């Protein structure tokens, strides 16, 4: 009975992507990054790569039948684009290769779902 109640409350043990807190910051730890889209959310609110170095992003879309991408912009106005990944229909995966960015903080989002967004740190 307790297990059945727990399963009902947790959605039957289905995958739930962790989400970092608003305003999360991060620092570069390498040139191979990863991010997952699930339930119209990213599992990370902050990504980071070393400045001026090409890096890859392993992009994993777990949302069945929903296209997502990752694009990096100067800020949340999304006027100046630095990188725009192709749309990936879910479930699906793609590896994006991104030319190095100058040092600073940038904005990333899913273009079809701009509420899916975060901070990109180049340092």
Residue ranges and their predicted role:
Residues 1-3:
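Sec-dependent N-terminal signal peptides
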Residues 5-23, 27-28, 41, 88-123:
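Extracellular/periplasmic metallocenter environments
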Residues 24-54:
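N-terminal edge beta-strand
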Residues 69-73:
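Beta-strand signatures of extracellular beta-sandwich domains
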């Amino acid at each position: 009975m307790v297990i059945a109640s727990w399963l009902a409350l947790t959605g039957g043990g289905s995958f739930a992507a962790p989400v970092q807190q608003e305003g999360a910051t991060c620092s570069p730890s390498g040139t191979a990054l990863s991010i997952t889209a699930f339930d119209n959310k990213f599992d990370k609110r902050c990504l980071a790569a070393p400045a001026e170095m090409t890096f890859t992003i392993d992009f994993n879309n777990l949302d069945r039948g929903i296209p997502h991408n990752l694009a990096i912009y100067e800020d949340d106005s999304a006027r100046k684009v630095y990188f725009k990944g192709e749309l990936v229909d879910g479930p699906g995966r793609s590896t994006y290769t991104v030319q190095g960015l100058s040092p600073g903080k940038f904005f990333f989002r899913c273009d079809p779902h701009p509420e899916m967004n975060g901070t990109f740190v180049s340092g």
